[in-house]
Amino acid sequence: MKVDFVVKDAWVFLTYRQCFEKRDVAVAGEKIYGVSPAICYPDATIIDGSGMYMIPGLVDIHMHIESSMTYPAEFSRITLPYGVTTVVADAHEIANVFGMDGIRWFMGQETLLDIFYA
């Protein structure tokens, strides 16, 4: 596996220990490849993570995007910088107003988040 970059010395939230610890994080493509106190991939780009914090992506399991008074593409642009990577959306309000056409329009939007519709 070719590692694209390594974030060195970041404070990484370890979910299994429920705390932050200094770690190196190796990334290959769009996936985290490894987390360790010391990672060495000579061909990888190094990013200095000193003083930075890393957490797993946040998942909002019940969201009414239309209640935010915006649409899915804009909602994802606003929330992603705060760590939200995935949303389970209940689009009943858009369905009440526009029916299936509204739901299809909502679901057809390109977003930066993973959005699942319930």
Q: Language model features by range: what are they?
A:
Residues M1-Y41:
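N-terminal metal-binding scaffold of metallo-dependent hydrolase/deaminase domains
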Residues F13, H64, H92-E93:
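Catalytic metal-binding/acid-base residues of hydrolase active sites
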Residues T15, A26, G49, G57-L58, ...:
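Glycine-centered flexibility motif
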Residues G34, I46-D48, Y117:
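Structural signal for conserved beta-strand scaffold positions within catalytic alpha/beta enzyme cores
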Residues A73-A118:
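Divalent-metal coordination cores built from histidine and acidic residues
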